[in-house]
Amino acid sequence: MLICNDKFNPKTLLEEIMALRPWRKGPFEISQIKIDSEWDSSIKWDLVKNATPLKDKVVADVGCNNGYYLFKMLEHKPKSLVGFDPGVLVKKQFEFLAPFFDKEKKIIYESLGVEDFHEKYPNAFDVIFCLGVLYHRKSPLEALKALYHALKIKGELVLDTLIIDSPLDIALCPKKTYAKMKNVYFIPSVSALKGWCERVGFENFEILSVLKTTPKEQRKTDFILGQSLEDFLDKTDHSKTLEGYDAPLRGYFKMLKPSKR
């Protein structure tokens, strides 16, 4: 949890926080008020925080949401830190949080998506984190190309995506929805993802972790509006989504942009 112990009027502060719902990423604690977000993002952060050193590096978080991971990255003392997300609400959340967790104003927040950010930042970053974005893209190869082009030579990508458990070079393409999400298009096997990344130009593809999503990590709280994981799974078989697909399984990966291609 990210904690700020500055003192504020608790009633006014809570009203501001609730007006910014839903809170997907977190948790945060400000002046003893806990923002109990839908996702316990510390679980994912613990899996990727030591993937590569960030000290004195130029670092990006693509699909940064409200900045939870950006604030955690500050603790590793990067040279610079840029977050990218086109969402309007999540930027408002970041602007609310930044005075508490980025008091030195080190983070740059850009309202750009994965398809667009590399045009403004070509060959710019030593490390890019892209967590929970790829399966939302209609063209995952184009998204991977954008990430590749935004990295410096010998830069590293830390990637998290939904995956399917299969030894084959295949991807699940949900017919209409996946776990009630309409914007999920391609969920690859690890082998298929490795092939995509290598076709784009990445090398040294490394599996960091594979983890099932559980209610410990994603659940309903008072700080979101609507449903969460328990509503997206089959009521009698939690190994399946409501649509009959395998329940969410996430892979965490690291790869390198080589010096020559």
UniProtKB/Swiss-Prot annotation:
Keyword Transferase: yes
Coiled-coil regions listed in the entry: none
UniProt binding sites for carboxy-S-adenosyl-L-methionine: 25, 39, 44, 63, 114-115, 135, 250
GO BP: any one term: tRNA wobble uridine modification
Keywords: Transferase, tRNA processing
Keyword Transferase: yes
Superkingdom as given in the UniProt entry: Bacteria
Reaction equations catalysed: carboxy-S-adenosyl-L-methionine + 5-hydroxyuridine(34) in tRNA = 5-carboxymethoxyuridine(34) in tRNA + S-adenosyl-L-homocysteine + H(+)
GO molecular function annotations of the record: transferase activity, transferring alkyl or aryl (other than methyl) groups
Gene3D superfamilies hit by this protein: Vaccinia Virus protein VP39
Cited InterPro entries: CmoB, Mo5U34_MeTrfas-like, SAM-dependent_MTases_sf
Protein family membership: Belongs to the class I-like SAM-binding methyltransferase superfamily. CmoB family.
Oligomeric and partner information: Homotetramer.
Database matches in HAMAP family: tRNA_carboxymethyltr_CmoB (MF_01590)
Protein name, per record: tRNA U34 carboxymethyltransferase
Gene behind this protein: cmoB
